[in-house]
Amino acid sequence: MKRDRLGRFLSPGIARQRGGSGGGCGSGRTRGRPSRSGGTSADGAAAQLSWGSMTRSCGDTGDDGTDEAGAGRTLAMGHCRLCHGKFSSRSLRSISDRVPGETSERLSPGERVFIRDFQRLLGVAVHQDPALPQSVCKNCYTQFYQCHSLLRTFLQRVNVSPAGQRKPCTKVGVQPTTVAEEGACVADLIASSPRCLHGLVGWVHEHAVSCGSLPSLQRTLSSEYCGIIQAVWGCDQGHDFTMDTASSCRALFLDSALAVKWAWGKDLSPRLAQNSESNPTGAASRLCQARETQVGSETKTLPSVDVALLHSHGDSVGPGLGPCTQPHLAPSEAPGQLGETQVPSSTSDDRVKDEFSDLSEGDFLSEDESDKKQTPQSSDESFEPYPEKKVSGKKSEGREAKRPEEPKIRKKPGPKPGWKKKLRCEREELPTIYKCPYQGCTAVYRGADGMKKHIKEHHEEVRERPCPHPGCNKVFMIDRYLQRHVKLIHTEVRNYICDECGQTFKQRKHLLVHQMRHSGAKPLQCEVCGFQCRQRASLKYHMTKHKAETELDFACDQCGRRFEKAHNLNVHMSMVHPLTQAQDRALPLEAEPPPGPLSPSGTMEGQAVKPEPT
């Protein structure tokens, strides 16, 4: 705020009037000084009274040329795109701003960094819809980039062995790192070299000559160690090309892990050690040349071994690594069919697995890699022409002694998890059968509890249990049978209710059969004719129709039809021959069969003795 001559603060209206009196609106003088034209003091007082109205009507600007009329207004408000909270414009960051710390030299002016990073991290595209907020609050912005940096660190370390991390030696007077140590550091980087990309472009051009399909990235193959990634490019016709983004790094890492003495020249070794820090790519190419000379010497000493076989044993790398790898490539059968995969030698792979047995072996491998690993080695393949190049036994023993002892894991007391499943499997394989020990009883049970219950009910507590309901003369030998009888016959408790029609039942199985009528389900079916029904009693009665008539014991006197049970015959007589059955009942009692021979008791045979009325 502005001050007057005495140091007092002026009100906003007076400050704006005094600051803008020299503008193009009005002819007032500053500080109320009299005009040179001899204006009266009354005019000056009137001018002082009209300063506020003149400022509002004219819209004078301040000393800095900006409109100060809106200084007292509230700031613009907006919503956060992520948390949907309402914030002032000072607390919002545009989604098109750059990341803090990145300069314009690294990014183009129109690049939307927050949108790019959000999509890369979460895989969700940020839509540029005008109806959506175009800003995020500072809190969400800071939290997002904290998670962004943390996840990037995790992605770089998730497939890297802790033993492979080396601190770079950049101080003066310190011995420079060797090629193996530099390779271990380079192996942590997941990036492709220019030569690798050059090889990919060359394959695309050769592929376009013989095939019209456009190749694209099919999948990525992660190697077993160091987080090295292989990119597989291919087309719809089956042509593929495996681009090993860091095969030289893999070779260097294997050398450092296994301490293998390679046959390097006297002049080549010091140059590699000197240039390993300054140019890792050049060191890797020279290492490839050294391996090429070694393979050449091996082919000279072993003429019977195929060159391609030696290449498959060595660290065969992709065609995109420059001239040092070209001699290792076998000529393809047709252009565009470059399906080579980069596989380390089986012997070195086995040794690496021994060294790094604690690493996960669940990485995805290509079909060619799995076939090569599963194929057993022949006598020629397992022959090693340079046994003196191996590390001596003393050194290996010393290395094993220096290896830190792994902390012993204390086992928790008690049974190990999964012991119940083992017992269950043993029971299923060899079921235990319990037979009733009482003579004449053929009861058999799979569990001991069932056998104990059987012995208690049928052999130990054997007694008659009559029904307590008056008028019911039924007797039961087992207590639970009596309880079921009382519940079903002598009580009207119906706890099972149908949800659709409201009908009640005493037993659950009756409710299930009733619900089948609503659903129309008929789970039982006749194996002979395909008849379907809901209850087993219906199916059992239906199966009697398929029996031969000779097997049926009860025959009808009128029509000759035979039945399995007497009850079925009585039903047939009452339904089909009701008149005949009525006539039989109406026969006079006097019509008796002819008298037969008397029995010793004084009655005729077949005649029942009737009690005399009292």
Swiss-Prot record:
Protein's UniProt keywords contain Ribonucleoprotein: no
Protein name (Swiss-Prot/TrEMBL): Zinc finger protein 276
Region (Disordered): 1-46, 271-422, 588-614
Membrane-spanning parts: none
Function: May be involved in transcriptional regulation.
Binding site for Zn(2+): 80, 83, 137, 140
Comp. bias regions, Basic and acidic residues: 386-408
Composition skew (Acidic residues), residue ranges: 357-369
Cited Pfam families: zf-AD, zf-C2H2
Biased amino acid composition, Polar residues: 272-282, 291-302
Cross-referenced PANTHER family: C2H2-TYPE DOMAIN-CONTAINING PROTEIN (PTHR24379:SF121), KRAB AND ZINC FINGER DOMAIN-CONTAINING (PTHR24379)
Zn-finger (C2H2-type) residues: 434-458, 465-490, 496-518, 524-546, 554-577
Primary subcellular site in the record, as a coarse category: nucleus
GO terms for cellular component: kinetochore; nucleus
Gly residues: bias regions: 19-29
Keywords: Centromere, Chromosome, DNA-binding, Kinetochore, Metal-binding, Nucleus, Repeat, Transcription, Transcription regulation, Zinc, Zinc-finger
